[in-house]
Amino acid sequence: MEFEFDVHKIFLEPITKLDNNLIPPRRPLISSSEAQKQIMTVIDEIGKASAKAQRLPASITSASRMQANKHHLYILKDCTPKTAGRGAVIGFLKVGYKKLFILDQKGSHIEAEPLCILDFYIHESLQRHGFGKELFSFMLRNEQVDVQHLAIDRPSEKFLSFLRKHFNLWSTIPQVNNFVVFEGFFRDRKASVKKTPAKRTEGEIKPYSLTDRDFLKQEEGLPWPLSQAQINLNRASSLGSSPTRACSRPPPGEEDFVKSLRNCRPHSLQRAASSEQEDHSQRRRTSEMNLSRGLLAQKNGYSRYLSPPPPLLTQGPYAAAQIKEQQSRTDSSAQEGRTQDRPNGSNSQHQNDLISSKQHVQDLHMELAAGRTMSDLKEGQNATKSPWCDHPSYTVLGTVLNAAWVKKKQELRSTRPW
């Protein structure tokens, strides 16, 4: 294969070895940049010729691939007098080490990193002239490897016949990949080979890793919060002499929390950790709230009939004077209204009914406002009389009265809220 430039100026030896730096062992006769450019051109052209001869869709040898991988490229040039002008390239051989899993004669997988033949090409016009054997033998001497220890990547039928003719390699070991190895590959190897462990059966596969299985072996007791084991915390001693309650449960540790994740449902840890405090605080809050609401209702005389609250019975002498004055005003106004609107015969009857209802309401107010016993309520009633006793009230507490009584009382007041 001829080129426009002089090949003898960049390849000073018959067979030149190149690595990923694309620098020949002997310095070319031209500038380094120009020599680098010409070497890349040679590699690209011979790679295309090899792909065309092997009927490959793309070339597997190029300058960019050589720079990206740690491969060795042996280039053979023509030194005959007829090409003394510019020279010519006869062929090339590309090799490199690869890590492979190779089957032996027994079918066992063996991990090895042999020297592999990746690409081999001799120009069609110069084949069967001994150039291929010369190039191959030079590579074996330079790499210091035996031919039976090589692995060949997808060899063609011509290449296999070449190996049988010149190196007596006939029997191959079937492989599951695209590489071909011959018998004697595992004999007298200088490079170390390593057998891969046999595949485990399905019964030996477990859902946890070794670390998880060791962790599960340590779970002898019940996980938190079922276990009541006490955990000594070093942080409490370092922060100072803070008092601790004997009845309180120590906070969970990190190990207990991780263990509980395997046995507890979501949010169960949070509910279990705060259940005791929530129950205690809920009971205390409910009881105190109900008691405070009851006292407030008793104090204000709450009712659904929007009547003004009755005054407290224990308000002092000034409050007693106001109560008497209000009582006298109410009695006088009620008496005037009854004399003007009702006949004398019916006034006495209504007055008797009103007095009885007033007495009943007074007893109920006395019981709820002060929270006293029946004996204390009777003494307070004799000592101080509330003006609310003579005034009709809309507040109905305790017993349920009929509608006729309510209607009669509204007629006496001459005021209807509805």
Curated annotation (Swiss-Prot):
The record marks Q54 as: Crucial for catalytic activity. It holds the Pfam family Acetyltransf_16. Residues 1-186 form the N-acetyltransferase domain. One of its GO terms (cellular component) is spindle. It catalyses: L-lysyl-[alpha-tubulin] + acetyl-CoA = N(6)-acetyl-L-lysyl-[alpha-tubulin] + CoA + H(+). One of its GO terms (molecular function) is L-lysine N-acetyltransferase activity, acting on acetyl phosphate as donor. InterPro entries: Atat, GNAT_ATAT. Residues 237-292, 322-353 are annotated as: Disordered. Keywords: Acyltransferase, Cell junction, Cell projection, Coated pit, Cytoplasm, Cytoskeleton, Membrane, Transferase. Residues 329-353 have a biased composition (Polar residues). Its EC number is 2.3.1.108. It is found in: Cytoplasm; Membrane, Clathrin-coated pit; Cell junction, Focal adhesion; Cell projection, Axon. Acetyl-CoA binds at residues 120-133, 156-165. GO terms for biological process: alpha-tubulin acetylation; microtubule cytoskeleton organization; neuron development; regulation of microtubule cytoskeleton organization. Its main location: cytoplasm. Belongs to the acetyltransferase ATAT1 family. Specifically acetylates 'Lys-40' in alpha-tubulin on the lumenal side of microtubules. Promotes microtubule destabilization and accelerates microtubule dynamics; this activity may be independent of acetylation activity. Acetylates alpha-tubulin with a slow enzymatic rate, due to a catalytic site that is not optimized for acetyl transfer. Enters the microtubule through each end and diffuses quickly throughout the lumen of microtubules. PANTHER family: ALPHA-TUBULIN N-ACETYLTRANSFERASE 1. This is Alpha-tubulin N-acetyltransferase 1. It comes from Xenopus laevis (African clawed frog).
